[in-house]
Amino acid sequence: MASNLYIVHHEFRAGTSSKWWKTAYAAMAPGGGWDEAVGANKEKGFFNHSANAVTANGPLYCIWETKEGISIEEFQEFIDGPTGPGFGLSALMNICKPIDTSLMNGQTPYPRVFS
């Protein structure tokens, strides 16, 4: 069995996008803790391959990978939780869709991090 890949569709709750962007930019700035958060999430079995914003007010689309054995329910809990992409702000509504790589003859959008 292999790791799991997901497309996550994020929509901002009304009036929350500017606070989310401010928080995201602060986290990604030098000393903001981004690298540590990425490492901690990877240790727990979650890895974000890409984040793709359509506009500043959303939506955003991300490609995530989870290590083998993590259920879609556990992934949703992580995505909605304080260490997920919402930074604990309750700013995002998150729709997680598993990618069925068997439909594309095993092709993945990115090389797997968890093998």
Give the positions of each predicted feature:
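Short S/T/G/P-rich N-terminal loop/turn motif that feeds into the first structured element of a domain
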Residues: 1-59, 65-77, 96-115
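A common structural junction motif
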Residues: 79-90
